C-alpha cells in the first residue's frame, strides 16, 4: 500500500510518468488490412465519439458486443467491473468488488467464461472463473452470447461471456496509462499499464502489461438474536432474544501483475496466430472482529474491573498467492476442399493460501485463547486440441464439423495444524485494550500440518467431443443448426487416508439452432434454441464425509453425479436507432433437468438424533425465465448528436422445489438495471457522464441456513479532458452513494428445526432458530485519476 502521498501528488506523478516516456512524434493514421481497419493508439486514448452497444453480424447466434470504448470512460479496473454495465449480469460479491459473474442471476457455474474464445480454469469449486482476475485494460471487447452453438462446449446454461483481448490486428502504436485510486480510509493505490502493437516480420504483434494495486476497506456490523421476526415481532428490543453484536473491519489488500502478448500472420491461404496472458496476484485479507453483549456499547472485556461488554476478540488473516496463465495457438489453411483449422491450448491455475485465525474468549472464568492455521493449495491444468473443417454446400450454405480433446487435472490440498487452545490468566483480561492489542500476541508454536477430512484429492477429467453444424447466410436471413456430442471420463482420487479411487463417465447429446431475420432496413428478429449442461461442482465430487458441515448435519460427497442439462430458448428483437444506436428486447426460458440438490439420505448424522447425512444427488428440476431490455444511442434525432444515453433492465425469475418448499435458484436477483448518460464537448476536448446501477434482492436456501441479500444503488461519474490527439486525463468517482450490502441469515441446527417441526416430527410452534443475524457491509466511495498517452 502507498500511504504517504496525497491524491494530488499521485496525479502529478501519473502525468509526469506518461509525458516523460512519450516520444515526440506519434503515428496518427490507422493501417488497413484485409480484415478492415486497425485501430490507432490515438483512437483508444483520445476517444473521438461515444461508444455504443453493437450487435453481432457474423454469426446466427444472439450476441451482444461491447467494445472497450463503451466502458473505458468509467475506467473499470477489471473485467468484472466492466460487466456491471451490461444486461442481466449480477454479482453477489462484497461491496466494490465484482468477481463471480451471474448471468441471468444464476450462480456463476451456470455461465461459461471464455477468454479469446477459450475456457480457462479457476480456483472456484463450481468451475467458474473470477472476472476480477482480468484487468480491464487488456480487453478489446466483451461479448454476451445468449444461447449456445454446437461449435462450442455446452457448459452454458445461462449463456456465455467471451472476453476478447486486444491483438496485433486491432491496434497500431502504443499507449501508457498511469494513475491512482483513493479509498475511503485514505489509502492510495497505483495503477500503471501499457500496450503496444505493430508489424513484425510477416505478421503483427501486440504486447501489454499492467500493474494494479487493489484495496477494499470494508466495515461490517452484525446483530445476532436467538429468534427472528417470524416468531417474535419485538425481537429487536427483547433483551432475552438479543445474543451479541459484532463490529468487524475486513480489509482486502492486493497487487495484480498481468501481461499479454499476441502474434498473428494472415496469408493468402494460411493464417497463424499465437496468444497468451499471465496474471499474478498477491492478496491479503485481514479481518478483525469484536463481539459485544450489548447492542451499542464499545468498551473493554466482560468480567474485568470495571466490567465491560467485550466477549470475543478475533483476528483472521488469509494470505493468497495466485498465478494464472493461458497459451493458445491456431493454424488455419484454406484449400480446395474448404478450410481446416487446428487449435492447441494450455491453461494453468495455481493458488496457495495460508490462513490464520486467533481468538480470545473473555466470557469465562479464565479467558481462553484458540488458534487455527490452515494451508490450501489448488492447481488446475487444462490441455486441449481442437480440429475443425468447413466447406461450402452451396452458394449460401456451408457445413462445419470437428472435434475437441481435453485433459483436465485438478489437485486440491487442504491441511490443518492441530488446534491450539488454552486458558489465559485473569491478568490477561484486566486492562486488555482491543484497539491496541491483538490475539496474535498469545500465539504459540503449532504442530505439524495434517490433511483435513477429504482435503487431499485429485480429479482428472478427460473429454472427447464431436460436432457437426450447418449454417446459411442469405439476403435477410442468417441461420445455423447443429449438434454436439460430449463424452467425459472422470477419475477421482481421495488421497486422505484411507485412499479411495472412483471412476465415472457420462455422455450428452446437445443440439442447437439459431436464426436472425431482418425486418425492414433496420430491424431484426433473433431466435435460438439449445440444450446445454452444467457439470457437477468439484467439492460435491469428493467421496469424503464432512461432519457438522450443514448446521449439525453432515455432508457426504457423491462422485457419481451426472451433469445437469437444460433445454431453453431465446427470442428477441433489435432495432437500430440514429447513427449508431440500438435498442433490443429479449425473452428467455430454461428448463433444467437432473438438478443437483442436497438430499437427506435418512442416515443419522454424527451429532446424533435429529441430525442427518446429506448428499448431493441428481433429483430435482428447475425453471428459469425472464425479460431483458437494453438501449444504447445518441440523441441526434432531437438535435443532440454529442449526447449518448444507455440503459438496460432485466426481470429475472426461476422456480425450484426442494425439501423445504418452493424457491428461486440460489442467489438469483429479482431484477437488475442500470442507465447512464455521456456528454461529449468536442469544441473543448472534454466529456463527462454518469451511470446508475441497482440490483434486486436475492435469496439462498441450503440445509441449515437461509440468506436474504440486498444491495444499495451504485452511482459512478467521470470527467474527461483531452489534450491534442495523444493525451487524455480522467477523474472518476465510484460507489458515490456508499451503497451497503445487507444480509439477513436464518440459521438452524437440524432439518426439523428449519421445517418448523419438533425433533419427533410433530408440528412445532414456529421454526426453531439457532441464530438470526443481520449484517451490513460498507466500503465508502473510491476516486480515480488516470492519464493516458498514445505514441
Residue ranges and their predicted role:
Residues 694-698, 721-791:
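C-terminal beta-signal and adjacent terminal beta-strands/loops
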Residues 589-591, 609-699:
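Gram-negative outer-membrane beta-barrel transporters
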Residues 91, 118-146, 194:
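Short acidic/polar hinge/loop motifs at secondary-structure boundaries
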Residues 184-287, 318-338, 511-513:
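Transmembrane beta-barrel wall of Gram-negative outer-membrane proteins
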Residues 134-173, 177, 218, 790:
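A beta-strand signature from Gram-negative outer-membrane beta-barrel systems
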Residues 43-74, 100, 108-111, 118:
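N-terminal periplasmic "start-of-domain" segments of outer-membrane beta-barrel proteins
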Amino acid at each position: 500500500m502507498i500511504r504517504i502521498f496525497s491524491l494530488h501528488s499521485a496525479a502529478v506523478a501519473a502525468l509526469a510518468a506518461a509525458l516523460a516516456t512519450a516520444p515526440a512524434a506519434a503515428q496518427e493514421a490507422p493501417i488497413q488490412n484485409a480484415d478492415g481497419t486497425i485501430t490507432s493508439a490515438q483512437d483508444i486514448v483520445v476517444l473521438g465519439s461515444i461508444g455504443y452497444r453493437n450487435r453481432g453480424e457474423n454469426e446466427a447466434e444472439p450476441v451482444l458486443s461491447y467494445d472497450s470504448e463503451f466502458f473505458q470512460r468509467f475506467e473499470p479496473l477489471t473485467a468484472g467491473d466492466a460487466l456491471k454495465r451490461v444486461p442481466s449480469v449480477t454479482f453477489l460479491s462484497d461491496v466494490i468488488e465484482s468477481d463471480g459473474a451471474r448471468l441471468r442471476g444464476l450462480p456463476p457455474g451456470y455461465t461459461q467464461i471464455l477468454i479469446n474464445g477459450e475456457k480457462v480454469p479457476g480456483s472456484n469449486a463450481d468451475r467458474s472463473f473470477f472476472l476480477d482476475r482480468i484487468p480491464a485494460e487488456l480487453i478489446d471487447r466483451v461479448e454476451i452470447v445468449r444461447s449456445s452453438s454446437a461449435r462450442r462446449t455446452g457448459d452454458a446454461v445461462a449463456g456465455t461471456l467471451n472476453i476478447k483481448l486486444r491483438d496485433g490486428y486491432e491496434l497500431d502504436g502504443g499507449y501508457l496509462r498511469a494513475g491512482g485510486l483513493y479509498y475511503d480510509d485514505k489509502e492510495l493505490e497505483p495503477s500503471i499499464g501499457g500496450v503496444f502493437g505493430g508489424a513484425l516480420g510477416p505478421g503483427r504483434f501486440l504486447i501489454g502489461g499492467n500493474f494494479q494495486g487493489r484495496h477494499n476497506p470494508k466495515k461490517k456490523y452484525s446483530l445476532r438474536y436467538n429468534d427472528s421476526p417470524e416468531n417474535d415481532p419485538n425481537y429487536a428490543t427483547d433483551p432475552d432474544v438479543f445474543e451479541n453484536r459484532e463490529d468487524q473491519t475486513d480489509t482486502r489488500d492486493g497487487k495484480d501483475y498481468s501481461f499479454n502478448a499476441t502474434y498473428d500472420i494472415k496469408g493468402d491461404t494460411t493464417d497463424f496466430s499465437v496468444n497468451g496472458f499471465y496474471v499474478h496476484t498477491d492478496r491479503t485479507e485481514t479481518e478483525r472482529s469484536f463481539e459485544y453483549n450489548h447492542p451499542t456499547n464499545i468498551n473493554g472485556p466482560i468480567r474485568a474491573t470495571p466490567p465491560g461488554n467485550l466477549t470475543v476478540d478475533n483476528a483472521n488473516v488469509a494470505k493468497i498467492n495466485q498465478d494464472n496463465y493461458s497459451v493458445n495457438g491456431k493454424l488455419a489453411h484454406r484449400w480446395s476442399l474448404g478450410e481446416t483449422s487446428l487449435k492447441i491450448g494450455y491453461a494453468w491455475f495455481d493458488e496457495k493460501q495460508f490462513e490464520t485465525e486467533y481468538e480470545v474468549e473473555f466470557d469465562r472464568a479464565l479467558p481462553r485463547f484458540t488458534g487455527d492455521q490452515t494451508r490450501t493449495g489448488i492447481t488446475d491444468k487444462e490441455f486441449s486440441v481442437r480440429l475443425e473443417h468447413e466447406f461450402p454446400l452451396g452458394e449460401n450454405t456451408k457445413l462445419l464439423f470437428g472435434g475437441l480433446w481435453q485433459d483436465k487435472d485438478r489437485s486440491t490440498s487442504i491441511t490443518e495444524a492441530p488446534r491450539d487452545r488454552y486458558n489465559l490468566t485473569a491478568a490477561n483480561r484486566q486492562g486488555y485494550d482491543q484497539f491496541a492489542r491483538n490475539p496474535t500476541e498469545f500465539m504459540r508454536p503449532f504442530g505439524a500440518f495434517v490433511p483435513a477430512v477429504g482435503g487431499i484429492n485429485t480429479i482428472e477429467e478427460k473429454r472427447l467431443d464431436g460436432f457437426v453444424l450447418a449454417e446459411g447466410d442469405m439476403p435477410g436471413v442468417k441461420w445455423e443448426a447443429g449438434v454436439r456430442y460430449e463424452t467425459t471420463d472422470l477419475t477421482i482420487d481421495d488421497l486422505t487416508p484411507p485412499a479411495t479411487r472412483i471412476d465415472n463417465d457420462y455422455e450428452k447429446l446437445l443440439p442447437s439452432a439459431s436464426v436472425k431475420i431482418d425486418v425492414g432496413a433496420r430491424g431484426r428478429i433473433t431466435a435460438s434454441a439449445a440444450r446445454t449442461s452444467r457439470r457437477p461442482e468439484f467439492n460435491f465430487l469428493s467421496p469424503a464425509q464432512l461432519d457438522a458441515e450443514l448446521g449439525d448435519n453432515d455432508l457426504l460427497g457423491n462422485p457419481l453425479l451426472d451433469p445437469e442439462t437444460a433445454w431453453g430458448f431465446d427470442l428477441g428483437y433489435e432495432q437500430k436507432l440514429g447513427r449508431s444506436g440500438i435498442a433490443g428486447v429479449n425473452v428467455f426460458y430454461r428448463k433444467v433437468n437432473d438438478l443437483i440438490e442436497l438430499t437427506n439420505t435418512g442416515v443419522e448424522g454424527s451429532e446424533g438424533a435429529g441430525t442427518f447425512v446429506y448428499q448431493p444427488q441428481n433429483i430435482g428440476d428447475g425453471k428459469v425465465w425472464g425479460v431483458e431490455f437494453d438501449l444504447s444511442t445518441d440523441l441526434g434525432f432531437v438535435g443532440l448528436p454529442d449526447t449518448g444515453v444507455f440503459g438496460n433492465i432485466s426481470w429475472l425469475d426461476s422456480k425450484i422445489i426442494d425439501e423445504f418448499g418452493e424457491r428461486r435458484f440460489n442467489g438469483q436477483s429479482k431484477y437488475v438495471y442500470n442507465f447512464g448518460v455521456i456528454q461529449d464537448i468536442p469544441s473543448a476536448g472534454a466529456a463527462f457522464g454518469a451511470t446508475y446501477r441497482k440490483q434486486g434482492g436475492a435469496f439462498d436456501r441450503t440445509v441449515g441456513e437461509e440468506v436474504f441479500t440486498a444491495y444499495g444503488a451504485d452511482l459512478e461519474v467521470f470527467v474527461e479532458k483531452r489534450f491534442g490527439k495523444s493525451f487524455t486525463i480522467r477523474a472518476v468517482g465510484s460507489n458515490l452513494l456508499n451503497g451497503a450490502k445487507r444480509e439477513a441469515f436464518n440459521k438452524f441446527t437440524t432439518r426439523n428445526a428449519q421445517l418448523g417441526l419438533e425433533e419427533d416430527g410433530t408440528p412445532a410452534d414456529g421454526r426453531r432458530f439457532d441464530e438470526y443475524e443481520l449484517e451490513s457491509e460498507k466500503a465508502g466511495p473510491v476516486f480515480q485519476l488516470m492519464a493516458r498517452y498514445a505514441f
